[in-house]
Amino acid sequence: MARKKNTKRKVKKNVPLGIAHIHTTFNNTIVTITDLNGNAVTWSSAGALGFKGSRKSTPFAAQLAAEAVAKAAMEHGMVKVETFITGPGPGREAAIRSLQAAGLEITAIKDVTAVPHNGCRPPKPPRG
């Protein structure tokens, strides 16, 4: 007889409050929604939605990533979200707006971008 495979089923958690972590770089935007303990509920990124190359860094890609995450989080029963934004990317505002437009209530917006006390040398600017 064939052995039954041990597969993990996705458990639908009922999480009414959560934290939305928006990580924007110059190349991509990653949106993760966690519960209050920091356990990931859902995540998405511009690259995961099929955007490639320079299209990943657009505000539109960030908007779609945030919409996808918001819909998935609302399936888990999420209503209110606190937002932490990291990074200098172009998708910052677009991601927040689309979270709000999708129906999640944003209770707080915090910018938690790490600022060096003159640590590593930044990359040289591109020359046109």
UniProtKB/Swiss-Prot annotation:
GO terms for biological process: translation. One of its GO terms (molecular function) is rRNA binding. The keyword Ribosomal protein applies. Part of the 30S ribosomal subunit. Interacts with proteins S7 and S18. Binds to IF-3. PANTHER family: 40S RIBOSOMAL PROTEIN S14/30S RIBOSOMAL PROTEIN S11. HAMAP family: Ribosomal_uS11. This is Small ribosomal subunit protein uS11. The lineage of its organism: Bacteria, Bacillati, Mycoplasmatota, Mollicutes, Acholeplasmatales.
